[in-house]
Amino acid sequence: MARIGDGGDLLKCSFCGKSQKQVKKLIAGPGVYICDECIDLCNEIIEEELADADDVKLDELPKPAEIREFLEGYVIGQDTAKRTLAVAVYNHYKRIQAGEKARDSRSEPVELAKSNILMLGPTGCGKTYLAQTLAKMLNVPFAIADATALTEAGYVGEDVENILLKLIQAADYDVKRAETGIIYIDEVDKIARKSENPSITRDVSGEGVQQALLKILEGTQASVPPQGGRKHPHQEFIQIDTTNVLFIVAGAFAGLERIVSDRVGKRGLGFGAEVKSKAEIDTQDHFAEVMPEDLIKFGLIPEFIGRLPVVASVTNLDKESLVQILSQPKNALVKQYTRLFEMDGVELEFAEDALEAIADQAIHRGTGARGLRAIMEEVLLPVMYDIPSRDDVAKVVVTKETVLDNVLPTIVPRKPSRTERRDKSA
């Protein structure tokens, strides 16, 4: 054991050599001693290493082409939206890395601004699923919020800070990890103000919510009630910085196409102008031509639009795309139901015309890809009820007639085994 000869029998730290008189605390172990200063130093080293391990590594960050390729495995169609999202997400996390390097070296000459994303398009076309798949690939916390439940602070409804609580919960209350997560705000078109002109009366669930969202979209130090609900003075808050949180704001924006049509149609005035019929204007991809003034006319305030510089539009899915969605992605519905039937020892098969009929039904109902599962459930319900109680079924074949005329699927009986035939003959 280390001693200091001229100071009596003083113990000293086995790591830095300081005596017990030179430090505040000396902790003894089996044959060794460590002082409080060395403990603090070790703690700092460990925290720095853990922080480095938690950060999104730039060299590990997938390139835009790799992000798009990953999305292709789960989402059919929407190629323009995939490219837009891939570039926006890559640039967002590259910006976070640049900020971290600037803090370390203090030499970053340009401060990179955040680019949140606005997604436009009809319901059931993959907006939510695209965002969920992105978060899954990047392994970052992901939260979904419904804009229709939000109200301005002080009114009945949810405060905008509750959106951040969902993200913190998705990160298991790891605030540092939540600060690099993704928040998807759906139904944002429902918080458009009622008219293009500013209202004299209070619009607490429309323009008021847009105003309340401005700060967290841009980046702020927000105080979040740990149990949700309304804030009150006697509770503790979780502090979260939203500067590096990526917001994807989405909505169906029904009626926006008419605003775009009116603006695009006005181009056909004057000599030599290309004149288009209303039918031709209506069939083009309106959302791809959306301009900020169209969104302002729809009811979003300019400050809100300004914080959503990246616009990604999704289009209605045609019959061919819906058929591909049923069978091709990694989590395709056909694969899911096939697996369910396999668990009962039965093979499930869909005729090609049956898949086309299911796609036609979804288009007719106007539910897009979201309605495919409901149709599949209706078609397969009778056999899913009977099959578990039977042991004589080898295969179930779903045909076009099954979908359109409520005819039961074709049942292929199972051939009895040699033992069963022997027992039967005996």
From Swiss-Prot:
Matching SMART domains: AAA (SM00382), ClpB_D2-small (SM01086), zf-C4_ClpX (SM00994)
CC terms in the record's Gene Ontology section: HslUV protease complex
An individual GO BP term: cell division
Recorded superkingdom: Bacteria
GO molecular function: ATP binding; ATP hydrolysis activity; ATP-dependent protein folding chaperone; protein dimerization activity; unfolded protein binding; zinc ion binding
Boundaries of every ClpX-type ZB domain copy: 1-54
Entry keywords, A to Z: ATP-binding, Chaperone, Metal-binding, Nucleotide-binding, Zinc
The keyword ATP-binding is annotated on this UniProt entry: yes
InterPro entries membership: AAA+_ATPase, ATP-dep_Clp_protease_ClpX, ATPase_AAA_core, Clp_ATPase_C, Clp_protease_ATP-bd_su_ClpX, ClpX_bact, P-loop_NTPase, Znf_CppX_C4
Sequence positions that bind ATP: P122, T123, G124, C125, G126, K127, T128, Y129
Binding-site list for Zn(2+): C13, C16, C35, C38
Assembly behavior: Component of the ClpX-ClpP complex. Forms a hexameric ring that, in the presence of ATP, binds to fourteen ClpP subunits assembled into a disk-like structure with a central cavity, resembling the structure of eukaryotic proteasomes.
Family statement drawn from the similarity comment of this UniProt entry: Belongs to the ClpX chaperone family.
Physiological role: ATP-dependent specificity component of the Clp protease. It directs the protease to specific substrates. Can perform chaperone functions in the absence of ClpP.
Protein's UniProt name: ATP-dependent Clp protease ATP-binding subunit ClpX
Native organism: Mycolicibacterium vanbaalenii (strain DSM 7251 / JCM 13017 / BCRC 16820 / KCTC 9966 / NRRL B-24157 / PYR-1) (Mycobacterium vanbaalenii)
Lineage: Bacteria, Bacillati, Actinomycetota, Actinomycetes, Mycobacteriales
Gene name linked to the record: clpX
